[in-house]
């Protein structure tokens, strides 16, 4: 159990660092969203969070107390921090487009960056009744039918009340339908943990994932290059992309975690600085997500030089990583101070701190 939690923390730590790197590219430097590294980062980090959430959710009974805990952890800071962000943004010197008011933000598709906590809570709400149905299904095929039917309902609802192109989505249904499959995949990975272990340790499955990943990624981020594919095919390609990402990520990070955190000659483990760094980021991933926007700063003078050299992967990744490291450090410091106040910790970090 301990090792599993540690490799999940490593995965979350790497993923949240990629989140900040992506925002450095799109909000600090700006104007270079066509860079491949941005498109890559934008597709690989969030599936990890939703998979882990689904995996850890399977053991929950989802009675009212569990939902109350999720509400306090996710929805309270969603409303408070997003409102503060809308107020603060005009003073940030960032030039990225953002909603003019809090009501506009709540009606937008991406919620000005704060969509994740709302989407995750909505997934818990959907899973609550679905879990009761799954418990009553005696066979795997019956469970899959229930999951596919739920997915179809979410897709239909999203088609009626959500539009990324029009930047409209009051209830968050669009992103809910995007990430429902990988969340449920996490649930099934926990339920059938022995089979999941075989998948992540199998060279065959890793090869399949490595082949599917670039193909699915290409159809999602460069749809204009595959005009022969109907738009609706994304309801299949996106889940395939997310599952491929998770298989590759777990297959890579789990052995690393075992090496880093395994006891040495009967003594306590001595993980490297890198492993300890990403593990710590993983334990503070929600705090980093909620607060890091406030510490982004303009880097627009870098736009033209980077465009002039063709937006190369390595220099852009290096710049984004260095800036992200600084932003994460400041964010963690502020989160530590906020965490000393139980009220502020709840409102701004989603943490319930006992006095």
Question: Model-found features: residue ranges?
Answer:
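Membrane-interface helix-boundary motifs at transmembrane edges
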Residues: 4-5, 61-69, 130-142, 190-203, ...
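Interfacial loop-to-helix transition and helix-capping segments at the boundaries
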Residues: 34-46, 104-119, 160-182, 218-245
